[in-house]
């Protein structure tokens, strides 16, 4: 079948342009997104085991800096099948049983190498992009957690699963991040307190959503936010049926009252569902004192639950706390931190890094340059970390389709997909980097390339990456190595 698309003003990703022919290399089982040149490209033909889909990366508006009234356009919304003016792109997919060799699709030449990439659910890479279901409901104009809402979320969540996502973001309280999101997060658990002071809990929505997320392929881990919300405020329904909102700060008597009975009951409920071993009480950039109190409280009251934390300190600074999943801010990664990772991995603990409103680069902002998102995805493989954490996958602003502006942070910080379910090019490049990371893991485990892997990994020092700007060259070095 013949497909013709138009592309404008772009750079080539994950391929080499030879004259008017684009050459790309893939492993069997791989899916790769590539940008096309700034000319008309004829992509034609079909082959058993290899498919090529094409589309356009459409322009999206964004402000150049937070609170700025200066706007720009950037091609970012990747729509398969689109023939609208925009950058052309193709998604190349090689089946696990594809025959190695050269495949010509007009001006696109695909070389399938004799190596096999496992399916995303089998990747060891730990991807943790936080989801926001309420944002989907608002954008689609449907009732939260209605049949229509789940139908709208499903393709978005399955696309995230296809990138190797290992966690499902759930909420234990209203507004776990206070009011920083455009759409409010609600609680998936209802807390009730009777006149005699007894507590009861309704897990109906929690169960429904976790089951849905798992059907979409998200998990197995369940990240529960949080016992330490920003502002410390929690809600419950009082004896008169009215919602009570009050502070529950770690160390105060009401904290123990509010969370004590809940943790015991929650653990029993999770055990009955078979989810206890996969569930984390998750916290975001909380103080050492808060984390210490909460972790000890959880270990005492509900020892089957795990603790997850995103912070900017080495795990050893919480030496009296067992943190099962720790994510370090990229700006604070140094060799002493990395030296602790192997011991944590031997204990079955997860250690990742995260980017958010910082660093300025490399990142996945609208303003980020070519290669940055790829580098962010690949970086953990080079330094021995398990993966990447990022807020957020889909916490959109007012216009989820045409404008990535968000008043508080750099444009693109809050979302990697669009309200119609289209991925951003940033997300596709992040996924390309994750795929390359998984390839490097496979090559490392196979042995025989230690010197080359060491040389490549040396290029990925976090502090040098933050100060650097040659991300396209790094991407090329990675792709050349894992595809040779």
Explain the meaning of each model-derived region.
Residues 20-104:
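Ligand-binding face of N-terminal immunoglobulin V-set domains in extracellular IgSF glycoproteins
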Residues 1, 233-236, 247-279, 283-313, ...:
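Catalytic domains of carbohydrate-active enzymes that cleave complex glycans
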Residues 325-409:
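Catalytic-core region of carbohydrate-active enzymes that cleave or remodel glycosidic bonds
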Residues 5-18:
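Hydrophobic h-region of N-terminal signal peptides that target proteins for export
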């Amino acid at each position: 079948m013949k497909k013709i698309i138009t592309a404008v003003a772009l750079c080539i990703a994950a391929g080499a342009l030879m004259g008017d022919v684009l050459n790309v290399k893939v492993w069997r089982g791989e899916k790769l997104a590539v940008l096309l040149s700034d000319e008309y490209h004829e992509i034609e033909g079909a082959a058993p085991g290899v498919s090529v889909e094409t589309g356009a990366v459409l322009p999206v508006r964004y402000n150049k800096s937070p609170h700025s009234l200066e706007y720009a356009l950037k091609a970012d919304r990747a729509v398969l099948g689109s023939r609208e003016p925009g950058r052309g792109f193709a998604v190349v997919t090689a089946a696990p049983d594809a025959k190695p060799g050269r495949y010509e699709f007009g001006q696109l030449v695909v070389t399938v190498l004799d190596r096999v990439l496992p399916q995303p659910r089998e990747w060891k890479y730990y991807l943790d992009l936080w989801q926001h279901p309420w944002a989907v409901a608002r954008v689609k104009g449907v009732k939260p957690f209605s049949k229509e809402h789940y139908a709208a979320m499903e393709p978005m969540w399955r696309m995230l699963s296809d990138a190797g996502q290992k966690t499902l973001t759930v909420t234990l309280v209203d507004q776990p991040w206070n009011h920083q999101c455009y759409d409010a997060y609600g609680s998936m658990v209802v807390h009730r307190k009777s006149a005699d002071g007894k507590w009861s809990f309704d897990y109906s929505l929690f169960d429904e959503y976790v089951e849905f997320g798992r059907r979409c392929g998200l998990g197995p881990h369940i990240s529960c936010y949080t016992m330490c919300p920003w502002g410390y405020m929690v809600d419950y329904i009082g004896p008169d049926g009215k919602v009570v909102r009050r502070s529950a700060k770690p160390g105060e008597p009401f904290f123990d009252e509010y969370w004590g009975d809940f943790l015991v009951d929650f653990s029993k409920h999770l055990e009955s569902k078979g989810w206890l071993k996969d569930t984390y009480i998750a916290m975001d950039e909380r103080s050492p004192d808060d984390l210490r109190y909460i972790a000890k409280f959880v270990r005492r009251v509900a020892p089957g639950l795990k603790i997850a934390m995103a912070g900017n300190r080495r795990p050893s600074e919480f030496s009296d706390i067992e943190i099962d999943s720790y994510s370090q801010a990229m700006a604070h990664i140094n060799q002493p931190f990395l030296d602790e990772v192997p011991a944590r991995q031997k204990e079955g603990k997860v250690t990742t890094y995260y980017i958010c409103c910082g660093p300025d680069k490399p990142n996945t902002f609208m303003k980020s340059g070519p290669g940055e998102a790829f580098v962010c995805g690949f970086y953990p493989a080079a330094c021995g970390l398990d993966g990447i954490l990022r807020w957020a996958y889909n916490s959109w602003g007012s216009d989820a389709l045409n404008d990535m502006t968000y008043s508080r942070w750099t444009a693109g910080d809050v979302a990697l997909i669009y309200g119609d379910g289209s991925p951003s090019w940033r997300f596709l490049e992040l996924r390309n980097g994750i795929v390359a990371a998984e390839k490097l893991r496979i090559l490392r485990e196979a042995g025989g390339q230690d010197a080359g892997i060491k040389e490549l990994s040396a290029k990925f020092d976090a502090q040098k990456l933050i100060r650097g700007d040659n991300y396209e060259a790094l991407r090329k070095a990675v792709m050349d190595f894992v595809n040779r």
